[in-house]
């Protein structure tokens, strides 16, 4: 899930991306994985358990992280050395991959999400691969993919977060739903991110489109604007700057962030750590984000790349995700750390839109939002 650089541990060796140079063990697919009838056997062929010394280059967004020991264990077991190359946010990584389609600068790409999926798949940048471990992935996440181009690795929700301590001090009740955010009693209290420059900003815009439809979302934003909503370019400026719980004397107790922000607040607090977060998530109006990994078409290390995809669905990686990237694992039954179980929000009715609809309309929606809110 593309999120800003907040809270990400320094747990992986990372190289910079420049355009100029920029458990392989498997289980058989059960009923939960869907039928493989009619699928090219080459697409489902599992990679070998180990390799001659091989380097696999992973292209990823800046927020990718994995614990050093988890990655080292994979490398020791398989003989594969993983070179992680980060190149900005998810949109930037996908754009660069599209520009180099067929002659990729890496072997595997992680971080394409459901707002970018149709564009990436339509550009033909991925070689199809159906991991045997896909059977263990949540069915709703598997349903987003056709043609075995990519594999769901994690998911999370972009949600409105509120500063509970601020509202308690003022004797006010925090907003409970999207409609409440336009109430005059919350005037000048909310900060959001620009959808043209921010992943959570785009997610929140898409949430309002999913809720209010083509005929109503601009009216909703007109009400937010009239109610004094502030727009920042990115998450850092909004959460760490203008949000009253962000640590820098911000004055706005309502911000667009992530459902996993409250547990992150505890994990990365200085000692003595608080027993509970001072912020919470407004469960209404969250937008579900899903991140995928895929083997890049044209790689000369396709089998090793497939092994890395399998690794991302294995329990060592899946268990590591919550506290490395503050996302939920895609594999059903993966245990969560206590801090996630207690404090990460799990909205029952997250909003979403079909990836193809997002791809077809994203630029138009962002342009219309810019005209309605910033001009």
Where are the predicted features?
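Early extracytoplasmic/lumenal segment of secretory-pathway proteins
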Residues: 23, 33, 37-119
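Periplasmic solute-binding protein
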Residues: 114-125, 145-173, 201-211, 288-294
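C-terminal motif of bacterial Sec signal peptides marking the signal peptidase cleavage site
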Residues: 17-21
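Short beta-strand->loop
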Residues: 127-135, 150-151, 179-182, 253, ...
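Mature extracytoplasmic/periplasmic domains
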Residues: 293-352
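Extracellular/periplasmic bilobal clamshell ligand-binding domains
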Residues: 338-375
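Ligand-binding pocket segment of bilobal, Venus flytrap-like solute-binding proteins
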Residues: 200-285
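A structural signal for short loop-to-beta-strand junctions that line the ligand-binding cleft
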Residues: 47, 104-109, 127-165, 179, ...
């Amino acid at each position: 899930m593309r999120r800003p650089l907040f809270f990400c541990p320094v747990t992986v060796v990372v190289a910079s991306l420049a355009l100029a140079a920029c458990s392989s063990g498997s289980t058989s697919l059960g009923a939960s994985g869907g039928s493989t009838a009619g699928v090219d056997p080459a697409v489902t062929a599992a990679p070998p358990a180990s390799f001659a010394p091989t380097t696999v280059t992973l292209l990823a967004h800046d927020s990718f992280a994995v614990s050093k020991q988890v990655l080292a264990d994979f490398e020791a077991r398989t003989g594969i050395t993983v070179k992680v190359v980060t190149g900005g946010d998810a949109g930037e990584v996908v754009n660069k991959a599209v520009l180099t389609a067929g002659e990729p600068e890496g072997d595997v790409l992680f971080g394409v999400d459901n707002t970018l999926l149709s564009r990436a798949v339509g550009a033909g940048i991925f070689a199809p691969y159906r991991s045997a471990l896909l059977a263990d992935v949540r069915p709703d996440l598997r349903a987003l993919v056709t043609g075995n181009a990519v594999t769901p690795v994690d998911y999370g929700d972009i949600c409105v977060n509120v500063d509970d301590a601020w509202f308690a001090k003022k004797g006010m009740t925090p907003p409970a739903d999207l409609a409440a955010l336009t109430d005059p009693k919350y005037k000048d209290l909310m900060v959001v991110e620009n959808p043209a420059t921010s992943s959570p900003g785009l997610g929140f815009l898409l949430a309002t489109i999913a809720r209010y439809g083509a005929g109503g979302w601009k009216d909703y934003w007109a009400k937010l604007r009239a109610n004094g909503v502030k727009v920042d370019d990115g998450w850092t400026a909004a959460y760490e700057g203008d949000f009253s719980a962000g640590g820098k004397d911000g004055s706005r107790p309502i911000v667009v962030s992530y459902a996993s922000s409250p547990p992150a607040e505890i994990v990365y607090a200085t000692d003595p750590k608080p027993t509970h977060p001072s912020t919470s998530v407004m469960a209404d109006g969250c937008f579900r984000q899903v991140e995928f990994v895929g083997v890049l078409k044209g790689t000369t290390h396709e089998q090793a790349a497939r092994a890395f995809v399998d690794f991302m669905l294995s329990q060592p990686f899946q268990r590591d995700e919550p506290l490395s990237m503050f996302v939920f694992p895609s594999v059903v039954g993966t245990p969560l750390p206590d801090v996630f179980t207690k404090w990460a929000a799990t909205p029952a009715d997250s909003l979403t839109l079909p990836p193809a609809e997002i791809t077809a309309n994203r630029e138009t929606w962002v342009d219309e939002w810019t005209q309605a809110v910033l001009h």
